[in-house]
Amino acid sequence: MSWTTPKRAFIGAATAEGGTKLNAFDNALLKLGIGNVNLVKLSSVIPAHIEWMEKVHDVPIGMLLPTVYAHIESDEPGMTISAALGVGISKNNEGGLIYEYSGYCTKEEAEEMVRKMVEEGFRQRGWELGEFKVASAEITVKDKPAAAIAVVVMFPY
């Protein structure tokens, strides 16, 4: 297998319920258009000059997709769960960083956490932050297991 530097990326977030926690996770992936592919977990560096997509489309079933993701599942009624990804893009789009967080919290709390992580990551590298993107999802568990997921999916084309 050969890997190439990604050229495009999609950022998104979703929640879902399911018969089990894993089914809830799968249902959230389906909402994002990535439920029929194989996610390959990445660490958190964005290549230079990446183009951002509005949505995922025409992805072959079973494709290996490099993905940074945060997720949480729960079957505890009344619990609020959230997942967030913060994306920092450097000035002149020379690269960037993605940080992920999930927990028993509101999406605003998760968003604040990833913003702090992005800012620290840039500070540690001596990079100047040009743009910040965030994707987050929140759900309160009712009578079925629930999941929240936030993703950045990278595409070689």
From Swiss-Prot:
Site (Cleavage (non-hydrolytic)): S43, S44
PANTHER family noted in UniProt: PYRUVOYL-DEPENDENT ARGININE DECARBOXYLASE
Cofactor: how and how many bound: Binds 1 pyruvoyl group covalently per subunit.
Listed EC numbers: 4.1.1.19
An annotated GO BP: arginine catabolic process
Keyword field contains Lyase: yes
Cofactor(s) this protein cannot do without: pyruvate
PTM annotation (Pyruvic acid (Ser)): residues: S44
Reactions this protein catalyses: L-arginine + H(+) = agmatine + CO2
InterPro entries found in the cross-reference section: Pyr-dep_his/arg-deCO2ase, Pyr-dep_his/arg-deCO2ase_sand, Pyruvoyl-dep_arg_deCO2ase
Organism this protein belongs to: Thermococcus kodakarensis (strain ATCC BAA-918 / JCM 12380 / KOD1)
Molecular-function GO term, any one: arginine decarboxylase activity
Gene3D superfamilies in the cross-refs: 3.30.60.30, Pyruvoyl-Dependent Histidine Decarboxylase, subunit B
Family: Belongs to the PdaD family.
The name this protein goes by in its record: Pyruvoyl-dependent arginine decarboxylase
Keywords: Decarboxylase, Lyase, Pyruvate
Keyword Metal-binding: no
One Pfam family of this chain: PvlArgDC
